[in-house]
Amino acid sequence: MEPPKGDTVVKTEVPVKDPSLSVVDSKTKGVEDANTEIALSDEVEIETKGSDSTPVKAPSRTSSGSKKSVHWSPELVSGSQEPDQKAASSSSAGSNPYIARSPAETSDASLKDTMETVKGVLGRWGKRVAEAAKKTESLAGNTWQHLRTAPSFADAAMGRIAQSTKVFAEGGYEKIFRQTFETDPEEQLLNSFACYLSTSAGPVMGVLYISSAKLAYCSDNPLSYKNGDQTEWSYYKVVIPLHQLKAVNPSASIVNPAEKYIQVISVDNHEFWFMGFLNYDGAVTSLQDSLQAGALRSV
C-alpha cells in the first residue's frame, strides 16, 4: 500500500524498541487515523514525498525482528515551518505595534523627479564653483595689478600691509572715514575700495570711500610738497559731494586690458582717474549707484 502524497515513510531492517511509540496490531492497520507508516528494518530511510530532502540514515538499534506500525500525530508532520517562514508570517500578521509599513515609490515618474532634483543641485553647485573660481581669478589679477601700479612693487606690498594693520587697530574703515573727513551724523559709509589716484607726481595709493553723501579719497601715506623753501608733508584728499557728480566712466588700456581705470567727472568738469582697484567690478557698481543717487538729489 502506497502512502498518500505528502506523507512520510520510514524503513528499517533492524527492529527498534521505543516506548514512546504507540504500537498497534497489523490487523488494525488502516483503521487508525495514521498518515505515517514505519517498517522496521536494518537501515532507516526517511523520505518525504513532494519534497527535495535527501534520505537520512538513522543509527540501527537491536530488537526483535517483527514488523510494527506506528502512528504519528498529523500536526507534528504538517504544522511546522522553517524559521524564515515563521518570521515572515509573524511580521505579516502585524502583531508588533512598533512596526509600520509604507509602500515604496518605484514608478518611473518618481525616479525621473529624483534624477531631475540631482541634476538641479549639481548644476547650481557647478555654477557656484565657476563663479567662485572666476572671482578668485579676478581678485588675483587685480591684486597683481594693484601692486604693479606703484613705482615700487615692494613699497606697494609693505604699504598695503601697513594699511591693513591700521584698519585693524583703528576698528575698521568706518572709524577711519569719520576721523579723516567731516561727516554728518546721519551720513553712512556704504563702501570702501583700496586703489590709486593718478596725480602729476604719479599714482598715489589710498582708499576711496563711498558714503550716502559723498565720494572721498585719502592717501595711505602723507605726500611731500614744497611750501616756499620748506618741504612739508600732508595727506592727499579728494572730496566730491554726490550731487556734484556728473559722470562715472570705466575703461581699460588698449595695450594691456588688465590695466583698468575709472574716470570720475564733477559737474564743473574736474576729472579724477582712479586705478589699481583690488575689487574693480564692485567699485564700478558702487560709483554708478552713487551717480544715480546724486542725480535724484539734484532734481
Swiss-Prot record:
Its GO CC terms? Answer: vacuole
Domain (GRAM) spans: 175-252
Cite the record's tissue specificity text: Ubiquitous.
- Which residue windows does the record flag with biased composition (Polar residues)? 78-95
Q: Where is this region: Disordered?
A: 1-112
Basic and acidic residues: bias regions = 1-16
* InterPro entries assigned: GEM-like (IPR037848), GRAM (IPR004182), PH-like_dom_sf (IPR011993)
A Pfam match is GRAM
Q: Name one GO biological process term.
A: regulation of epidermal cell division
**What biological function has been recorded for the protein in this entry?**
Involved in the spatial control of cell division, patterning and differentiation of Arabidopsis root epidermal cells. Could be part of a complex that negatively modulates GLABRA2 and CAPRICE expression via the maintenance of a repressor histone H3 epigenetics status of the GL2 and CPC promoters.
Q: Which family does it belong to?
A: Belongs to the GEM family.
Kindly state the subunit structure of this protein. Interacts with CDT1, a DNA replication protein and TTG1 (TRANSPARENT TESTA GLABRA1), a WD40-repeat protein involved in GLABRA2-dependent cell fate decision.
Name of protein: GLABRA2 expression modulator
Q: Which organism is it from?
A: Arabidopsis thaliana (Mouse-ear cress)
